[in-house]
């Protein structure tokens, strides 16, 4: 089974934060999860709120566990709130259904994991995360 290496996870984090600085975003927090939803790498920039790890992880966790992007999860939550409520019941409240959760795929389309970015608007979080994933030579789906 293909996976995100620790080196690639660190690259994703580093390049996501660099993109955030380039875009002049608020301080970001970034987590990279493997295909089982386990953290591989996390960083919280100076000035980011201490609770941002759980938000970043929740964005990524929903993506990897359901095979959906953060945008798709948001849309599903708006259309069928009962679905996301049920999912959060099943996953102990760990799913945050908003953009900034990004599926990570290899070139064959296999899901390798997910990235969660938080700190600015959800759309800006997603843009920064996509840049980090691309810099690691992987494919992001926000």
Which residue ranges define each predicted feature?
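Flexible, solvent-exposed loop/hinge segments and secondary-structure transition points
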Residues: 1-142
């Amino acid at each position: 089974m293909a996976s995100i290496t620790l080196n690639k996870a660190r690259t994703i984090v580093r390049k996501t934060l660099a993109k955030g600085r380039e875009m002049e975003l608020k301080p970001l927090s970034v987590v990279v999860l493997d295909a089982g939803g386990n953290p591989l790498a996390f960083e919280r920039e100076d000035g980011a709120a201490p609770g941002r790890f759980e938000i970043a992880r929740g964005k990524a966790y929903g993506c990897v566990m359901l095979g959906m992007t953060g945008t798709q999860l948001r849309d599903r939550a708006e259309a069928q709130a009962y679905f996301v409520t049920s999912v959060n019941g099943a996953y102990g409240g760990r799913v945050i259904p908003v953009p900034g959760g990004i599926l990570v795929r290899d070139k064959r389309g296999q899901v390798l994991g997910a990235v969660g970015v938080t700190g600015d608007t959800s759309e800006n979080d997603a843009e920064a995360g996509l840049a980090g994933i691309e810099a690691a030579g992987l494919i992001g789906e926000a």
